[in-house]
Amino acid sequence: IRARKCTYFTTLNPIMNNMSGFRGMYLEQCLKNVKENAPTRFGLFVNLDWEQIDAPDFLENNLTILREAKTAGAIGLKVYKGLGLTDTDSSGKRIAVNDPRLDPIWAACGALGFPVLIHSAEPASFWKPKDKFNERWLELKQKPGRYRDPAKVPSFESIIAEQHDIFRKNPGTTFINAHMGWMANDLDRMGAHLDTYPNVMTEIGAVLAELGRQPRRARKFFEDYQDRILFGKDSYKVSEYYTYFRVLETHDEYFDYYRKRHAHWKMYGLGLPDSILKKLYYKNALRILPSIDASLFPKE
């Protein structure tokens, strides 16, 4: 069964999306490369430079970038975690996710039909003391730069609240809340979040381990919100995909996550039905990214 469905995934997903299309000449070269070599196989998201927010022509320039990117073939806007966390203005002040100077950009994305894939903050554990009660203590030991000192950076909850504020203020814009908004450990909260913001989708990149340790609750979540979830992954490493397939598609029990620095628990399969897997793997993406060539995918 696993082998059949893994093949099923690859044949139904002939598209890869590059979230780092950048902008300007770099985006132009990326789009040119795609059009000349594999015009139907890649989607490119544009990126903006928030740290130019104080420039007199910041808004005009970025609205132009979005319009031209859309015309040239880009399919969305990707917002990296630096916004709200490390990006600063010309005076060194942190730029909040919901900085009102950015409001016209979110609105423009809605008008253009440009989904906004937004990654805000980090796992909440990165703000917590590095002790035996922190599930990601080993990761923070091995990668100390991931620790977020509450005395030096805004709290996890404050950054997340800023993100949710732009969802609220822009109901006409489709947002994809990356990494399940770091709420995969609390699916009741995640469900309430999706109920509150009907313009928000989410994706499962980097949170598989949280889903795999609560298979019954996670399966119920996928059943309830099957039209709101996308398949996502931070990096393209083929060997890691099989753990995703195993969690999503099988009823296997008590197996390891693919990394050793965190997720020190066993994983369990959700055994999702084909009807949900198809939505997760491609149907939901086709709905919110209509420029993707739907003829590459089965109709059923």
Can you describe what each PLM-predicted range is?
Residues 151, 157-300:
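H/E-rich (His + Asp/Glu) clusters that bind or coordinate divalent metals
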Residues 1-40, 60, 284:
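An N-terminally biased module of ancient metal coordination in phosphate/nucleic-acid-related enzymes
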Residues 23-24, 55-59, 95-99, 155-159, ...:
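A conditional alpha-helix N-cap/helix-loop micro-motif detector
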Residues 8-11, 42-47, 77-79, 116-118, ...:
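Hydrophobic faces of well-ordered beta-strands that scaffold small-molecule active sites
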Residues 17-18, 51-53, 84-86, 122-127, ...:
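Active-site environment of divalent metal-dependent phosphoester hydrolases
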Residues 26-147:
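Active-site gating/metal-coordination segments in enzymes
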Residues 2-9, 71, 110, 282-286, ...:
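Sec-exported extracytoplasmic/periplasmic mature domains
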Residues 4, 38, 72, 111-112, ...:
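Helix C-cap/helix->beta junction micro-motif
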